[in-house]
Amino acid sequence: MAELQEVQITEEKPLLPGQTPEAAKEAELAARILLDQGQTHSVETPYGSVTFTVYGTPKPKRPAIFTYHDVGLNYKSCFQPLFQFGDMQEIIQNFVRVHVDAPGMEEGAPVFPLGYQYPSQDQLADMIPCILQYLNFSTIIGVGVGAGAYILSRYALNHPDTVEGLVLINIDPNAKGWMDWAAHKLTGLTSSIPEMILGHLFSQEELSGNSELIQKYRSLITHAPNLENIELYWNSYNNRRDLNFERGGEMTLKCPVMLVVGDQAPHEDAVVECNSKLDPTQTSFLKMADSGGQPQLTQPGKLTEAFKYFVQGMGYMASSCMTRLSRSRTASLTSAASIDGSRSRSRTLSQSSESGTLPSGPPGHTMEVSC
């Protein structure tokens, strides 16, 4: 019998090469995002079924981050680039997240039958208490884009005690006027539903540039298997009522609010007008340069930074959590008392595209930011 010999095999390339601490951290982050697929639920409401996905576990005495997407999108296509951004992990590890898909917008949703009465924007807002009751959540920090921002605002007006803060991107609080309707009808004669929705989501400059992002979202919407459902959500949004915000009146948002819009975005004027109607001691206004119509897609880093300071101002993240940002950013802040000598202050923060931060502390001021 041949004698057994011990043979030593050396790997040509190590399976686990040495990693720097930074690379190891990035790998850990990627693995955590990959493994955390969320749990999807559906709940029946008086206006039909609604689907939502929950990430993380509830944290004691902390609100849930609660998102609502815009027309033509679902929660993934609207929010994934933001919530999967590296620095955002500092925030989401401290909160449970609830991502709502408007009825018929969830992945794999069947097309509604002909003649289906899609919920109004007010009715979509009235579905939210059913979700929170199902999850046994008492308060939220809402993050909404476009139609989702409108829906969360309507909910906050009806249930102010359950909303601790709102981040409203591209909000238009006004109902469509006759001129808007005429323009909408005229556009409908010459443009398809996907093109009209793309014009709602992105600026004309972005659409003309036809970047990879635009090509991706044009394809997603044009070839969506639930395009009929998307059109119903679109019509619901275009039939919205005026929120009737009034500075100093009863119809106003009573929680801290951060308004966000891209410079030259389709909804820039509407967001500026909304800012003029809200309580200046509770409202921050973030106008983002070079971000187009969807800043959560094009500038997730800048929006993450703003969101961190917004949450910190609400008292939910200690300043020690901000050390990484503090090392990598510099701020230029000018504060001035208001002309009428009232207690509210106006703060203007100038940011270049490379550096700048939002001021920390409670959101007791109106803040206009260009970044």
Curated annotation (Swiss-Prot):
Residues bearing PTM Phosphothreonine: 20, 330, 334, 348, 357
Modified residues (Phosphoserine): 326, 328, 332, 335, 338, 344, 350, 352-353, 355, 370
The protein's role, per its UniProt record: Contributes to the regulation of the Wnt signaling pathway. Down-regulates CTNNB1-mediated transcriptional activation of target genes, such as CCND1, and may thereby act as tumor suppressor. May be involved in dendritic cell and neuron differentiation.
Source species, domain of life: Eukaryota
Organism: Rattus norvegicus (Rat)
Sequence similarity: Belongs to the NDRG family.
Subcellular compartments: Cytoplasm; Cytoplasm, Perinuclear region; Cell projection, Growth cone
Protein name as annotated: Protein NDRG2
